[in-house]
Amino acid sequence: MKRYLSVLLTALLLLSCLTACGGKTTLDPDNPVTLTMWHVYGEQADSPMNRLIAEFNATVGQEKGILVTVTNVTSTSKISAQLEAALTGDPDTPEMPDLFSTHTNTAEELGTEHLLDWNTCFSEDELKNYVPEFLEDGTMNGKLVVFPVSKSTYALFLNGSQFERFSADTGVTYDALSTWEGFFDAAAKYYDWSDGKPFCAFDYLIRHVEFDVMAKDGALEYTEDGWYDLQNPSLEESWMKFARSLAQGHIVVSDQYSNTQVMTGETLGGIGSTAAITYYNDTVTYPDNTSEPTNLKVLPLPRSGDGEQYMPMTGVGLSAYATTEQKAEAAAVFVRWLTEGERNLDFVVETGYMPVNNDAFEAIEGYEFPDAGYASLFDAIKTMRDGYTPVVRPAFGGYYDKVDALYEGLRQMQGELRERSDNGESADILAKEIWDFFCSVQ
Amino acid sequence: MGVFSAFHYPKWSMRRKLFGYMILLAAILLLALMAGLFLFGRFDSTERRTFESLDIQMEVFEKDVSAHFDRLAAESLHLSEDMTVFLEEYLAEQEITFSDLTDSDDNIAQIQDLMIEHLRQTLLQEDCSGVFVMWDTTVNQSVANAEFSRTGVYLQQNGYKNTDESILLYRGLAEVGKKHGIMPHRKWRLEFQTDQFPSFDEVCALSGLPLEKSYYLTERFTLPGTSEEAVLMVAPIVGTNGSFYGICGYEVSASYFTTYHAQPTKIAHLTCLLTSGGAQTLDADAGLSCGVAGDYYRTPNGQLSVKSAGDGLSYFNGDEVSYIGLTREISLSPNNQPHTVAVMMLRADHDRAVMKSFLQNAVLWALLLFFAVSCCLYFSRHYLKPILKGLEQIKSEDRTEIQSSVPEINDLFVFLAEQDRQHEESLDAVTREKQTVQQEKEILQSKYDHAQQVYDTAQAEYVRAQEELTEAKKELDRLAYSRKDEIDPDDYQHFLSGIRELTKTEREVFEWYLLGKTAKDIIAATGIKESTLKFHNHNILKKLGVSSRKQMLRYAALMKQLEQGGIADDTCGQAE
């Protein structure tokens, strides 16, 4: 009898799996299923994802009975906390969305048991169309819980109009920014040239320190509790390289997003996610309301020495909250549609991401970009993809709380440090203070 | 009674008649039920129910929208008054005029610094997605398009939570914003561009009106640099001397409207629209829409042509989606044309509901009919079963031990048993009588047989006697023939004439003799006495002129022969 029951249960389980993503459809065009969605594409701006969703709803969605409704457009820095609040039923938070942008570490915090395993919805042949590293990045405990939709890296964004003037006056060229040494030298020159303006705002400063260490040592060891090994002399050395520039006000940790500091004329450039291109205005407006075209120039990350170079592989993927078979099937239809070759290419070009689809990646070579800023962005991406090793972001528990505390502390410190530097204090001493602060972050 | 006469059809079985009566009863009950449902409004059409649901929803939505925008209008006026007071105090403190603010980055920065907290608190308190104050001045008149550039502060809420952390600086000095912990919006700009914000000129023109009548609701527009669309509730900021300082107001973005006005209703995929436009078309692109809380709705797009659908409803046909619902005019500002609020549901949903209702009714009535027919069949069969069984049992031989569940049948059995008993008693009597009659019949038969034997014997004797008579006649004839010549014709004539003289009795006796009867036979046959016979014999012989009876018989035989022509003509001739 037990054997019979177990066979029956297994058969039912298989049947449910088949009906969820493979077998007879659970979708009904006359009674559409709604997928609520939170994403991070185009917060506070024109959202290419929202336009794609509208297109999906009007075409495939209408045909198959799926309606994707965006209930929250947020940012990668906020979505994790918002999802966790939704999952725990925070009264001020909307219900847990059916689809959401997420990192693998967020997926882990949410609990992979709550998330749909996309492997059950895509065949092996279908998955072969995606970049294997991106699929691997979204896989946890054998389950593909974060489906790659787009991947980003970091790049250096510059106000081209102002850089031309700066270059004409100082002789600093874009080529000079290909190494950190050239970069910091240019930053120092700009600070002087601009009467004390930072050259560049960094969104994720610590990652560049990491890559610098890795370029020297080939690897970076983390401690058991998921933080940096502060006894590592290479780490301190690399940190001090950035800290000196920071202490002198040549670079800053961005207030929130480096692009806002570029478009307000506060800095000449910013280093942040390639996806930030969506948020750059066409013009830079200065406090006297004068403005000029941004003429956005995007460069690869400066290189650290002559060894192997590293670049971050960031960018959220899509996860689905495991609820009903019908929603699972609908989510798979939507994600499959969203990541199809040409559509994926259009989407990533518009949002500044790297495609996840092999076909789209190949097609990007001959793509006609809408403006020079996007063209230079994808040139930079291509350069890095060809010459840099992608590194996934750390996914330790509590890591990002410490990083946030680090950045917040640096923001608090940097103004005063710059004043002290301007007043003649040693950059090394000030940088040591920054190192000490880094060491104090727990 | 015409209906019931049909049930008197003699060829219909009792079951069929009862079934007919029950079906008739069921039909009457169903009709009564239908009439009741109709009277109590349960038979209202789907359109009617849809209208009532949407009408209630319209009341709610209209009230929500009206209250919301009335509140925003009032708050816009309050903000305008506050800004007037604030600005004039600042100008007085600085001993400058409003026009001195132009190109004065310091004053503008100070003004923004002083007002930004007030705006932040206002934004946190009000039901809106943004708040702004646009001063009719600019920080730099020399830049290109400065005629459209206006300084001010525009704060926006970002995200679904109305919290301090989610406030962004959409327009204004970034440094001032950062100083107060308000980060620039991703699409931040320093100043407003009046050519990108609607109705600046319209509201400027309203500044001459009393403040309470000067607010204005803009058309829906795209917030510059974003894909978000919004309307603004705007009021002019007017100085105490009547000079125009700028405008202020509140933003209601399309996404905020969708969230804030989501209707807690069970109407699936309800779509509510606030837009401008007339009765013939609704411009969905110019409106704000919302749906059902916790559900989705199809965002209306483009122009929706309005066509009457009857029952107070209208069809709203768009390029992609069609709806059914109703509209009302609503006045949100004295300076705007009346807006239109529409409460709609998907036409496809409605059509499905109509079809579903029809099918439900059809199935319901089919079930009722099936149930009624089944019940009639079952109950008529069940009811008649004991009766028919009783009738079958009545046909059976033995009814003595029968018990039925129908008392009337039992009474009938008692009655029939009594009848049977009486019948058997009668039958016994008849049987007995029959036996008696049979016995009598047998006796009579026996008697008859005996009589028959007697008769046969007599018949045989008669035949024999007849033969003897025949022999005797033959003998007589032979004798007469032989003795014809011995008879005296006169005597014979006398004999013949003497016959005519015989009395009746004598003639009768004479005839008996002629028949061959003996005296004894004649006495027995006539009942006369022997002496009387002798007396008659004497008289007969005397009158016939014969001496003896033998002679008389001879003459008589001769006479018969002559009458029959049996004797030769010569005798007759002689006799004549």
Question: Can you describe what each PLM-predicted range is?
Answer:
Chain A
Residues E362-E365, F369-Q442:
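Conserved C-terminal helix/tail region of periplasmic/extracytoplasmic solute-binding proteins
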Residues A247-Q248, P287-P355:
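Extracytoplasmic/periplasmic substrate-recognition and gating elements
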Residues Q62-E133, R165-D169, L268-G269, P287-T290:
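Extracytoplasmic "Venus flytrap"/periplasmic binding protein-like
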Residues F184-Y191, T223-D255, L301:
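Glycine-centered hinge/linker elements that transmit conformational signals in sensory
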Residues N141-V149, Y154, E181-Y228, T267:
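Extracytoplasmic/periplasmic solute-binding protein
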Residues P48, E237-K241, Q326-L338, K402:
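Short amphipathic alpha-helical coupling segments at ligand-binding clamshell hinges
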Residues F100-A155, E181-F184, P293-P302, Y367-D371:
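Hinge/lid segment of periplasmic solute-binding proteins
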Residues S6, L18-T106, L417-Q442:
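Conserved N-terminal structural module of periplasmic/extracytoplasmic solute-binding proteins
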